[in-house]
């Protein structure tokens, strides 16, 4: 009985050592999963990051909340100024005298460095302008000029934004457009695995920085704005957003440095796409499309277009159709992608356990002898005889620790 009990204690100790080893291995980079988040400008990469932070309960501090509030106010004003400028370009005249006055007020307003909030008068002008029929005519032709996808959200929530005690909600933060400049890294742990999600600005002038992020990447997440098939770029109004995205995807996935890197294609803004496809045919972007307004057919066609950009025909492409503004979509996508990554890196996990067995074999034998002598002090461990059944599970990747 004493010998059996001692063996159980040694097994428990080995399992404990394994857990500590894997955690340490993660800290040292052995289980450091670096994931590169790429995509053209305004594809929704930053929204994906915000949702991951929420899922892993990474708190937004007061300074960040304040920054979000400031950007919400600035975005709201910018969106109406863009609409008014587009109306002039398109030759759509504002016929109502009151509307003209409000338009002049909004167009002439500028945020000064010390001004962090739009005045109530400007906010009310914007709210009334959004209701105007001529402004809606401009909005109906939004495929002809650059705009923010969240434009209606800002205008529909403007009363709340104007409140003196306004604090952005989680949805407000998700919907806030903050242009990514430089390189942003979001880190979180899951078990012994340390994830680093690297987000780099998607605008053309930011892409030269991407090369600095290409080393030691475990996976590529390429985010696409589905609604971009009927939108133009901020940097170049003559260029279609989706065509730009396709070109960029081809350049990235065919780079030799990523020949063995798992690639995930995230077709984002599905909610907007489902609305747009009913009004604007996909053939506007792809003349060879013949599927009409059927959402499923259109999504499969777009997915095929991206698949065709991969020169290695046998390279798998894992694809998701989502709306990143909804946490459940990101949670599902992340769980699926994470499972694939851990499965493909199972050899690393197994090597970690193999190294541990070698280093702990001698200490286990000596522990067995010492534990036998102290048998009478260890009666409370009898119920642990089947602990872990010789396995430890790391998010679906099972590592055996017994020969």
UniProtKB/Swiss-Prot annotation:
One Gene Ontology cellular component term attached to this UniProt record is: heterotrimeric G-protein complex
Region annotation (G2 motif) maps to 172-180
Q: Where is the signal peptide?
A: none
- Residues bearing covalent lipid (S-palmitoyl cysteine)? 3
The UniProt regions of compositional bias labelled Low complexity, in chain numbering, are 374-389
Q: Where are the annotated segments for G3 motif?
A: 195-204
Give the record's keywords alphabetically. GTP-binding, Lipoprotein, Magnesium, Metal-binding, Myristate, Nucleotide-binding, Palmitate, Transducer
Instruction: Report whether Translocase shows up as a keyword of the record.
Output: no
Cite the binding residues for GTP: 39-46, 174-180, 199-203, 268-271, 324
Source domain of life is: Eukaryota
* InterPro entries reported for this sequence: Gprotein_alpha_su (IPR001019), GproteinA_insert (IPR011025), P-loop_NTPase (IPR027417)
Identify the stretch(es) annotated as G5 motif: 322-327
Q: Which Pfam families match?
A: G-alpha
- Residues the entry annotates as binding Mg(2+): 46, 180
Q: Where are the transmembrane segments?
A: none
Known role: Guanine nucleotide-binding proteins (G proteins) are involved as modulators or transducers in various transmembrane signaling systems. G alpha-8 is a potential analog for the G(s)-like G-proteins which stimulate adenylate cyclase in mammals.
What family is this?
Belongs to the G-alpha family.
Q: What is this protein called?
A: Guanine nucleotide-binding protein alpha-8 subunit
């Amino acid at each position: 009985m004493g010998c059996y009990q001692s063996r159980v204690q040694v097994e428990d100790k080995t399992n404990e050592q394994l857990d500590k080893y894997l955690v340490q291995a993660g800290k040292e980079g052995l289980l450091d999963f670096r994931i590169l988040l790429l995509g053209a400008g305004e594809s929704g990469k930053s929204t994906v990051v915000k949702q991951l932070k929420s899922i892993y309960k990474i708190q937004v501090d007061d300074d960040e909340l304040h920054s979000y509030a400031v950007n919400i106010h600035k975005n709201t004003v910018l969106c109406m100024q863009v609409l008014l400028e587009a109306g002039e370009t398109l030759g759509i005249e504002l016929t109502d005298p009151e509307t003209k006055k409000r338009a002049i007020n909004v167009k002439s307003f500028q945020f000064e460095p010390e001004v962090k909030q739009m005045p109530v008068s400007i906010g009310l002008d914007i709210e009334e302008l959004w209701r105007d029929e001529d402004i809606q005519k401009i909005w109906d032709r939004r495929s002809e000029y650059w705009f923010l996808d969240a434009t209606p959200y800002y205008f529909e929530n403007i009363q709340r934004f104007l409140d003196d005690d306004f604090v952005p909600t989680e949805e407000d933060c998700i919907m806030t457009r903050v242009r990514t400049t430089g390189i942003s890294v979001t880190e979180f742990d899951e078990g012994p695995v340390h994830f680093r999600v690297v987000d780099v600005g998607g605008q053309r002038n930011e892409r030269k920085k991407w090369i600095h992020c290409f080393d030691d990447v475990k996976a590529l997440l390429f985010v696409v704005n589905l609604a971009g098939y009927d939108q133009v770029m901020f940097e170049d109004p003559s260029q279609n957003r989706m065509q730009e995205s396709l070109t960029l995807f081809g350049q990235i996935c065919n780079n030799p440095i990523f020949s063995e890197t798992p690639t995930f294609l995230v077709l984002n803004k599905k909610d907007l796409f489902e609305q747009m496809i009913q009004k604007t045919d996909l053939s506007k972007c792809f003349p060879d499309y013949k599927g009409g307004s059927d959402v499923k057919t259109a999504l499969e066609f777009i997915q095929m277009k991206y698949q065709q950009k991969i020169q290695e025909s046998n390279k798998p492409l894992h694809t998701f159709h989502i709306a990143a503004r909804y946490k459940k979509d990101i949670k599902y996508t992340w769980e699926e992608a994470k499972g694939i990554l851990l499965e493909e890196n199972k050899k690393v996990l197994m090597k970690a356990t193999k190294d541990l067995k070698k280093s702990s074999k001698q200490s286990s034998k000596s522990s067995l002898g010492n534990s036998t002598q102290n048998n009478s002090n260890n009666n409370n461990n009898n119920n642990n005889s089947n602990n872990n059944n010789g396995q430890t599970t790391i998010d679906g990747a099972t590592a055996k620790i017994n020969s």
